[in-house]
């Protein structure tokens, strides 16, 4: 990869409207802020629409033993198994793990990370 092949997009992900697909969708701490079922389904639908076949979805969320809130906002916590279940229809699970993240404030937060490969467009 080079910097000419990277696209940074700043928008409300649930209102994403593009005319192209991506090879890599990297979400480090957005998905866990999406807490209602309809919005979770919309996010998954957008991943399916905008990640090209064979593309990668890399997602990091608070783990099951992570915080209940972040910056005063409600969040949803996930395990590797939870994420596998949510994305199983159109994405092949590649790997998943938990990681303890040290914050600038000297605390630690538990995260779940997963990597998936897009297998179909349904």
Predicted segments — roles?
Residues 26:
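A conserved beta-strand element that flanks and buttresses the S-adenosyl-L-methionine
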Residues 29-33:
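Short catalytic micro-motifs in class I SAM-dependent methyltransferases
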């Amino acid at each position: 990869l080079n910097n000419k092949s990277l696209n940074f997009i700043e928008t409300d992900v649930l209102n994403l409207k593009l005319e192209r697909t991506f090879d890599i969708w990297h979400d480090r701490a957005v998905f866990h802020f999406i807490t209602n079922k309809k919005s979770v389904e919309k996010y998954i639908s957008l991943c399916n629409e905008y990640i090209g076949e064979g593309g990668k979805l890399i997602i990091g969320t608070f783990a099951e033993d992570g915080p209940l809130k972040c910056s005063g906002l409600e969040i949803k916590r996930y395990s590797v198994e939870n994420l596998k279940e949510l994305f199983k229809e159109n994405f092949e699970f590649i790997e998943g793990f938990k990681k303890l993240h040290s914050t600038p404030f000297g605390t630690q937060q538990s995260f779940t990370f997963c990597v998936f490969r897009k297998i179909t467009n349904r």
